[in-house]
Amino acid sequence: GRADEVLAWQIRTALAGQDASRAGAVVYAYEPRWAIGTAEAASPDYVAERHGRIRALIGRDWGAPAADAARVIYGGSVNPDNGPALIALADVDGLFIGRAAWTAAGFFTLVRIVAQARLAARGAVAA
């Protein structure tokens, strides 16, 4: 629907005139408009669908290698409760964090929890 149209327009506008190597070198940060400035978090299913769509749009216009190389990160009420599930998603390459990292303790707690979840999702063991 409309969200897909807006995503396509934003990506095409930002990358107008760029070649595939440049499109693949960009870090794409996604946050649902309705989540900006709120404590309302998107479900992991919603985030997976949106990030998959972003990657598909990049692939359609700049090719699969650009889509695979692109880094797509998520923000939108990321916190210690939902961060592990979000970072474990296949198309989520990282997180950008707001109020959950306003303090050093909050930031380090989230980094530790998310790093452990990322390692577990990849089959590695956290130290």
Residue locations for each model-derived region?
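Glycine-rich beta-to-alpha transition loops that act as phosphate-gripper elements at the mouths
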Residues: 74-80, 99-101
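Active-site rim beta-loop-alpha module in soluble metabolic enzymes
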Residues: 1-67
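Hydrophobic residues within beta-strands of alpha/beta enzymes
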Residues: 28, 93-95
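Alpha/beta-hydrolase fold nucleophile elbow
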Residues: 69-72
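Loop/helix-junction capping segments adjacent to catalytic residues or to phosphate/diphosphate-binding pockets
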Residues: 44, 80, 104-105
